Swiss-Prot record:
Its EC number is 2.1.2.1. The record marks H229 as: Plays an important role in substrate specificity. This is Serine hydroxymethyltransferase 1. GO terms for biological process: glycine biosynthetic process from serine; tetrahydrofolate interconversion. Pathway: One-carbon metabolism; tetrahydrofolate interconversion; Amino-acid biosynthesis; glycine biosynthesis; glycine from L-serine: step 1/1. It is an enzyme of class 2 (transferase). The gene is glyA1. Its cofactor is pyridoxal 5'-phosphate.
Length: 417
């Protein structure tokens, strides 16, 4: 029998030590990985609730197990809030991750071997958009488009040319490292020209979309997926959205369960419901505007300091810095910044001469630092510190000086007050 007083402390101190160390790292380090953010304690409360005990295969009102009357209400709340937040007619809140939401879309709309056209991972796309190492590149005939390496922008005429040539059954719009605004009407027109489904993966910009600061793909796409973390600032999970279409809705539901998953994670669905409610608060738009302002301010510092920012700047929460001209690798830059307690991720850039394990770029994002309360002033200062380290790569004194300034800034802006 379990006790309500059970604690990890004193029972599994080795595990607790690692957990506490990670929480301390989050407080003491500046987080600039574009896909990371901090959730509210409300989201954490939902994830740590007794809902984790309940199996609930199926959908609200159509479960395969009994005792689901309360979790049905939880899931229905999440569904209704997701629909309201994004202006969708349909929402499936069960996918465990963005990749599983994407896999469900493939399963619902395609047959193995069908042709899909998505953005190349090397040019800012995502693994699930047709990369050879992903299920999307193994089970389907994946054709890739990229950016114009001169402008750093998607060349929609070229996307259309490739689409006409390969006749995809599904056209994918979305990215993991593209800093400009996607033209959803143009993607729709290209999809219509070749008779393809248009699938939009808005995982990185869902929070901006919810705040009305980035175009909403729902009016144009046959289906939209997103994660619920990143800019949306919720738990790690996935979400599928669409306009009203009874036939497609049934396909999406079946592709999630039983097609790709068993029982949903009800504690995570509850946390999604919390984050959707938080995203409807007036302050959420203010936060998202600050995310954009901070990213644009940081990108400008890099440009001023002589670094190449892919696409020439940013319209959203992230930007990609090419280190090719400086003769540096993303791997060594990532490590040097880590020693100064600044966390970024190495990232491939277009026409990267290095392997994906080394790379020639850094991806930088501002959702997490903005959650801490950083404004443009702090982000300009932070970008300058990063440039100092990159200009003096391996200089221990520079790293130590930056680390001390990082410590002071983190103390002034704790993650949780």
């Amino acid at each position: 029998m379990f006790s309500k007083q059970d604690q990890i402390q004193g029972y599994d101190d080795a595990l607790l030590s690692a957990m506490n160390a990670e929480e301390q790292r989050q407080e003491d380090h500046i987080e600039l990985i574009a896909s990371e953010n901090y959730t509210s304690k409300r989201v954490m409360q939902a994830q740590g609730s007794g809902l984790t005990n309940k199996y609930a295969e199926g959908y609200p009102g159509k479960r395969y197990y009994g005792g689901c009357e309360h979790v049905d209400k939880v899931e229905q709340l999440a569904i209704e809030r997701a629909r309201q937040l994004f202006g969708a007619d349909y929402a499936n809140v069960q996918p465990h991750s963005g990749s599983q939401a994407n896999a469900a879309v493939y399963l619902a709309l395609l047959q193995a071997g069908d042709t899909v056209l998505g953005m190349s991972l090397a040019h800012g796309g995502h693994l699930t958009h047709g990369a050879k190492v992903s299920f999307s590149g193994k089970l389907y005939n994946a054709v890739q488009y990229g950016i114009d390496t001169t402008t750093g922008l998607i060349d929609y005429d070229e996307v259309e040319r490739i689409a006409v040539e390969c006749q995809p059954k599904m056209l994918i719009a979305g990215f993991s490292a593209y800093s400009k605004t996607l033209d959803f009407p143009r993607f729709r027109a290209i999809a219509d020209k070749v008779g393809a489904y248009l699938f939009v993966d808005m995982a990185h910009v869902a929070g901006l979309v919810a705040a009305g600061l980035y175009p909403n793909p729902l009016p144009y796409a046959d289906v939209v997926t997103t994660t619920t973390h990143k800019t949306l600032r919720g738990p790690r999970g996935g979400l599928i959205l669409a306009k009203a279409n009874e036939e497609l809705e049934k396909k999406f539901n079946s592709a999630v369960f039983p097609g790709g998953q068993g029982g949903p994670l009800m504690h995570v669905i509850a946390a999604k419901a919390v984050c959707f409610k938080e995203a409807m608060e007036p302050g959420f738009k203010t936060y998202q505007q600050q995310v954009i302002d901070n990213a644009q301010a940081m990108a400008q510092v890099f440009i001023t300091r002589g670094f190449d920012v892919v696409s020439g700047g940013t319209d959203n929460h992230l930007f990609l810095v090419s280190l090719i001209r400086q003769g540096l690798t993303g791997k060594e830059a990532d490590a040097a910044l880590g020693r100064a307690h600044i966390t970024v991720n190495k990232n491939s850039v277009p026409n990267d001469p290095q392997s994906p394990f080394v790379t020639s770029g850094l991806r930088i994002g501002t959702p997490a630092v903005t959650t801490r309360g950083f404004k443009v002033t702090q982000c300009i200062e932070l970008a300058g510190w990063i440039c100092d380290i990159l200009d003096n790569l391996g200089a221990a004194d520079v790293e130590a000086n930056v680390a001390s300034q990082v410590a002071a800034l983190c103390a002034d802006f704790p993650v949780y007050r």
